[in-house]
Amino acid sequence: MLNRIIYDPFNDGLDTEQHFEKIHIKTKQRTKTKSITIIENIPEKIDLKLFLKKLKYTFHCSGSIQQNYDDDSKFIQLSGDHRELVKNFLIKNSIVKESNIVMHGY
């Protein structure tokens, strides 16, 4: 079994010397009353499975990790409109700074 080190953003805190790409948080309308929240450009050193698990537990929603086939990147998809909650969650847990978050759909 491989012993891999996983970056846990909930324990490590924000490292001020690291440069992250801007995280994009947007929503897409599925039907007239239902929507999904998409979180893109999550830093590669964050374990997406653990991050998704924390988001689903915190917001009481379903979610999944999706593959973007245009550039082979991964993003998180949550059911419902959770843009503000995700933004506050990222800032509160010191995962990224507020200046590195881009909100779409306002």
Swiss-Prot record:
The keyword Magnesium does not apply. Pfam families: SUI1. GO terms for biological process: regulation of translation. InterPro entries: SUI1, SUI1_dom_sf, SUI1_euk. Keywords: Initiation factor, Protein biosynthesis, Translation regulation. Gene3D superfamilies: SUI1-like domain. Additional factor that functions in concert with eIF-2 and the initiator tRNA in directing the ribosome to the proper start site of translation. Belongs to the SUI1 family. PANTHER family: EUKARYOTIC TRANSLATION INITIATION FACTOR SUI1 (PTHR10388). This is Protein translation factor SUI1 homolog. It comes from Acanthamoeba polyphaga mimivirus. The lineage of its organism: Viruses, Varidnaviria, Bamfordvirae, Nucleocytoviricota, Megaviricetes.
